[in-house]
Amino acid sequence: RQQARAAMWKIIGEIDEANQEALLEALPPEGWFYRSRFGEGVAQTAFLIVQHSDATLWRRFLPVLQPLVASGEVDGEAYGLMFDRLAVAEGRPQRFGTQVVCVDGKQVVDWPNIEDPDNVEERRRAMGFTTTLSEYQALFADYPPCS
C-alpha cells in the first residue's frame, strides 16, 4: 500500500510540475488570468495549479492576486487559502484560519496559530468567506481519522 501511494504521488508531482510550466509559459502580460477576460474556468484552473505548487509560486502570485480580490477578478476565499498555506509553510500565523491540523485523529481549526484571533471572523467576512470558522470546522466532522 505504501509503495502504491509513493508511486501515485510521484506521478501527481510530475503532472503538477508540467502544469506549472505550462501556466508560466501561458501567463498573460498583466500577470494573471482575469475572470473577465479568460472566463471562470481558466481563472480557477490557474489558481489551482498555483495553489498545488510550492512556496516559490505562492510568494510570486500572492501580491498579484491580492488587489484582484477587490475587483472580483480573484475569489477572496481562494486567495485566503493560498495566503494561509504560505504562512504555515513559513512558520507564521494564519490570517484566515483555513489550514487545519490533526489533533487526536481529527482535522481541526488551528486556533493557536491564527493571527489576531479576536478579529479573524471580521477578516474572513471582508475577504468574502461564506462560512465562519465554526462552520468551517463542522465541514471536517465526517472526515476519516487523520494521523
Could you describe each region identified by the protein language model?
Residues 66-126, 130, 139:
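An amphipathic alpha-helical core segment
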Residues 138-143, 147:
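Low-complexity, Gly/Ser/Thr/Pro-rich intrinsically disordered linker/tail segments
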Residues 1-93, 97:
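N-terminal helix-rich structural modules
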Residues 55-58, 132, 145-146:
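Secretory-pathway/luminal and periplasmic proteins that interact with or process carbohydrate-rich
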Residues 34-37, 131-137:
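Short, surface-exposed acidic
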